[in-house]
Structures are given as structure tokens and as C-alpha cells.
């Protein structure tokens, strides 16, 4: 198997996990400072 392909497959889950953690943390902090934004948008 190609070495670059193995490096790609092993990097994407790590980057994805970091990105999802950052996104979840960002949404949690937005809701902490502005708790009514989600309910006002309905």
C-alpha cells in the first residue's frame, strides 16, 4: 500500500476529531454567553 495513503488515512480522523471538538466547544461557549439565540431564531 502507498505510504502517503496510509498517512492520509491516519491523519483525517485526528483532524476530524479536533475540528468537531473545536466546533462543539465554540457552540457551547456561544450558548453560555448568549443563551437565548437558539430559542429566538424559531
UniProtKB/Swiss-Prot annotation:
Subcellular location: Plastid, Chloroplast thylakoid membrane
Keyword Plastid: yes
Keyword flag ATP-binding: no
Topology class, membrane: Single-pass membrane protein
Pfam (any one): PSI_PsaJ
GO cellular component, as recorded: chloroplast thylakoid membrane; photosystem I
Parts of the chain that traverse the membrane: 8-28
Similarity annotation: Belongs to the PsaJ family.
Function: May help in the organization of the PsaE and PsaF subunits.
Protein name: Photosystem I reaction center subunit IX
Protein source organism: Gracilaria tenuistipitata var. liui
Amino acid at each position: 500500500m502507498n505510504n502517503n495513503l496510509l498517512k492520509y488515512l491516519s491523519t483525517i480522523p485526528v483532524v476530524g476529531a479536533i475540528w468537531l471538538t473545536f466546533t462543539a466547544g465554540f457552540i457551547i461557549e456561544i450558548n453560555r454567553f448568549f443563551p437565548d439565540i437558539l430559542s429566538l431564531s424559531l
